[in-house]
Amino acid sequence: MAKGKFERTKPHVNVGTIGHVDHGKTTLTAAITTVLSTKFGGEARGYDQIDAAPEEKARGITINTAHVEYETESRHYAHVDCPGHADYVKNMITGAAQMDGAILVVSAADGPMPQTREHILLSRQVGVPYIIVFLNKADMVDDAELLELVEMEVRELLSKYDFPGDDTPIVKGSAKLALEGDKGELGEQAILSLAAALDTYIPTPERAVDGSFLMPVEDVFSISGRGTVVTGRIERGVVKVGEEIEIVGIKPTVKTTCTGVEMFRKLLDQGQAGDNVGILLRGTKREDVERGQVLAKPGSINPHTDFTAEVYILSKEEGGRHTPFFNGYRPQFYFRTTDVTGTIDLPQDKEMVLPGDNVTMTVKLLAPIAMEEGLRFAIREGGRTVGAGVVAKILK
């Protein structure tokens, strides 16, 4: 049988399964691909194919992740599933697998467990915007009241971490039954209900090109007779010749005007997300712009120095530190294209951080960086990556 080709005309959404070990994340992932492939085309993936997740490196960190794809009536989904808890932590913090929404798998037989809580908290910290719940193994619970109790517990837990617990879609089912071809309410029907919930509850993500213009500065040149050219890859939005833009970060913010956009030695009237361009700036001196700043739509992003972050510290095996660090540790924080020194403030109950740990910390940078919540960074010592993090909350 020929493999059904995915039509790229459908909007694309990134999702993933999260939840406690052995609650059925991988079985559910296999069940979704199996049920939806028969209905909408695509490829069914077995449990073993997904469980044998290949190792990949994101920012020098080893992560095991399985990637599957499936489609529904209206969308194309890319879905990530990780075999181990540590892989989830790394994946979510590095943003290796960006999620527009997550499917939280909770065993109806066990209810919420420590990693259930931790994954919800991580989702909040790293900015996963939507969570849908699949109450798995519902075939193993005969008591309807017990099922209701577990549902209430999950809703309360979501609300505790600022997700709308009362409005969160909760689908009850059995991934195992669905995978075995059971056509009943807890089998195939539950998977179809879950797919419908994904389609309706997670909004179509904004495309990069629709965002506010932002380009990290990679290099700066002076071209005699023409002025200063800044090169980089446009991260989001569009810039048109003649538009005002701001140079943000490191130094006080200044306004300038884009007088030219160049790509592959051709002049364009605009550049957009994904383009590697040179942008000509009017009246800006070469020494006014440096690597590590960003060009942005005026007022769209501000420079900040103080923030809280969710951080993963590389293990010794990953090439990280061999020893713990303590409060007041001062490494470099690598944002987009440059390193800035910063001081780390640990939570009161945390005396030290060991290689391989993940931790919430407060950081104070020596120079301001154009920053938004959800921005990823690396922690470095002398050019060597020792950690990865994401801005959870801006303080100043």
UniProtKB/Swiss-Prot annotation:
Keywords (A to Z) from UniProt: Cytoplasm, Elongation factor, GTP-binding, Hydrolase, Magnesium, Metal-binding, Nucleotide-binding, Protein biosynthesis
SUPFAM superfamilies: EF-Tu/eEF-1alpha/eIF2-gamma C-terminal domain, P-loop containing nucleoside triphosphate hydrolases, Translation proteins
Domain tr-type G: 10-206
Binding site for Mg(2+): 26
Chain spans, region G5: 174-176
Cellular component GO terms, alphabetical: cytosol
The UniProt record lists the keyword Zinc: no
Reaction catalysis annotation: GTP + H2O = GDP + phosphate + H(+)
Spans traversing the lipid bilayer: none
Superkingdom: Bacteria
Enzyme Commission (EC) number: 3.6.5.3
Region (G4): 136-139
Main location: cytoplasm
Location within or outside the cell: Cytoplasm
Sequence segments annotated as region (G2): 60-64
Region annotation G1: where it falls in the sequence: 19-26
Residue segments, region G3: 81-84
Binding site for GTP: 19-26, 81-85, 136-139
InterPro entries, sorted: EF-Tu_GTP-bd (IPR041709), EF-Tu_GTPase (IPR050055), EFTu-like_2 (IPR004161), EFTU_2 (IPR033720), G_TR_CS (IPR031157), P-loop_NTPase (IPR027417), Small_GTP-bd (IPR005225), T_Tr_GTP-bd_dom (IPR000795)
Assembly and interaction partners: Monomer.
Stated role: GTP hydrolase that promotes the GTP-dependent binding of aminoacyl-tRNA to the A-site of ribosomes during protein biosynthesis.
Family as reported in the entry's similarity comment: Belongs to the TRAFAC class translation factor GTPase superfamily. Classic translation factor GTPase family. EF-Tu/EF-1A subfamily.
Designated name of the protein: Elongation factor Tu
Organism: Bordetella avium (strain 197N)
Designated gene of the protein: tuf1
